[in-house]
């Protein structure tokens, strides 16, 4: 008789809690996010920036065809991590809800309303049979009365952040935010911080492997950062990192000299 692990029954059904209060399929969906490409967001007083890792697995893929920041409405965008096919379903649903709200009320949908609708859908996929949780998290950002930045979890939970990261490089990026983010940060510094946090998660950051978009309260329309500007930011960051490494080595040598 084959050995069956004690948690097997709870493992196969998304609607059954384990004895210790967990839904294993939701945990597995979170693991899919942890293995996904890194996405980061940073908010400043007058806007929000999103930056995403583009995992281009073949040199034959056209980089321009591989979008990772999705426009939901003029004033709202989303950056996913996890199973991109699942994320695309959520993005399509968000676009539909945004259109319905605009046609019904004659005004753009508030980001908080849209986030709640998407997370209601995510939560429903943890509660009913015949479906599975979405293996994707979304960073949803935009402006209405103020800039807003939300993280949506596969469980249906959502959180508003000043700066946040999802995906495989979350811990590294969040450490950068904890160290460098400040409440009075401006647009240029916010964009640079987002790129820095993302670059720290990559072995060789390049303009082809990173996508950046931002929105301001003045224009209320998302703009993609041109490649020339992105390369400029990356070069500045790499230069600063090299200078920091040189300073650290000099400090190490000074300590060794003192010990001798």
Curated annotation (Swiss-Prot):
Region forming the signal peptide: none
Protein name: Proteasome subunit alpha
Family: Belongs to the peptidase T1A family.
Gene3D superfamilies assigned: Glutamine Phosphoribosylpyrophosphate, subunit 1, domain 1
Alphabetical keyword list: Cytoplasm, Proteasome
Gene Ontology BP term (one): proteasome-mediated ubiquitin-dependent protein catabolic process
Primary localization class, coarse: cytoplasm
GO molecular-function term, one example from the UniProt record: threonine-type endopeptidase activity
Superkingdom of the source species: Archaea
Annotated organism of origin: Thermococcus kodakarensis (strain ATCC BAA-918 / JCM 12380 / KOD1)
Spans through the membrane: none
